[in-house]
UniProtKB/Swiss-Prot annotation:
Source organism of the structure: Streptococcus suis (strain 98HAH33)
MF-aspect GO terms: rRNA binding; structural constituent of ribosome; tRNA binding
The organism's taxonomic lineage, starting at the top: Bacteria, Bacillati, Bacillota, Bacilli, Lactobacillales
UniProt KW keywords: Methylation, Ribonucleoprotein, Ribosomal protein, RNA-binding, rRNA-binding, tRNA-binding
Gene: rpsL
3-methylthioaspartic acid: residues bearing it: D102
UniProt protein name: Small ribosomal subunit protein uS12
Known partners and oligomeric status: Part of the 30S ribosomal subunit. Contacts proteins S8 and S17. May interact with IF1 in the 30S initiation complex.
Pfam (any one): Ribosom_S12_S23
Job of this protein: With S4 and S5 plays an important role in translational accuracy.
UniProt GO cellular component terms: small ribosomal subunit
GO biological process: translation
Amino acid sequence: MPTINQLVRKPRKSKVEKSKSPALNVGYNSRKKVQTNVSSPQKRGVATRVGTMTPKKPNSALRKFARVRLSNLIEVTAYIPGIGHNLQEHSVVLLRGGRVKDLPGVRYHIVRGALDTAGVNDRKQGRSKYGTKRPKG
C-alpha cells in the first residue's frame, strides 16, 4: 500500500480499455503508405479464403468463415452468418465487429446483403440482420 506522499509524487494510472475489434480502429493512408488512427463502424475487405471450421468443446458444427484482407491491409477471420452463402475467393465483403463465442480467433461478422454478399434466401423473421428483402404478399 503506497503512502499519501508516494501517491502525490506518482499518482495511480487509470486502466485503458482494450478494443474487442482492433482492426476497425485502424485506417490506412495509401498515398503515404502508413496506418492512421481512424476508427470506423465497418470496413470493406476482399475474401482471401472461404471455408468451414469446427467450434470449441461442447458444440459441434461446421461454421462458415472467411479470411478477409481489409482496406487497411490487415487480414482477419470473419464469420459468415445465416444459412448458405455465395462468397468465394476475391469476393468484396463488408465487415462489422462482433465475435463468435465458440470459434477461437473470430472477432468479426460479415454483413449479409452488402457489396458482393447476398442476403439469406426464404427468411421471414429477423430479415434485417441477414439482408433479406420483404416477401411479396
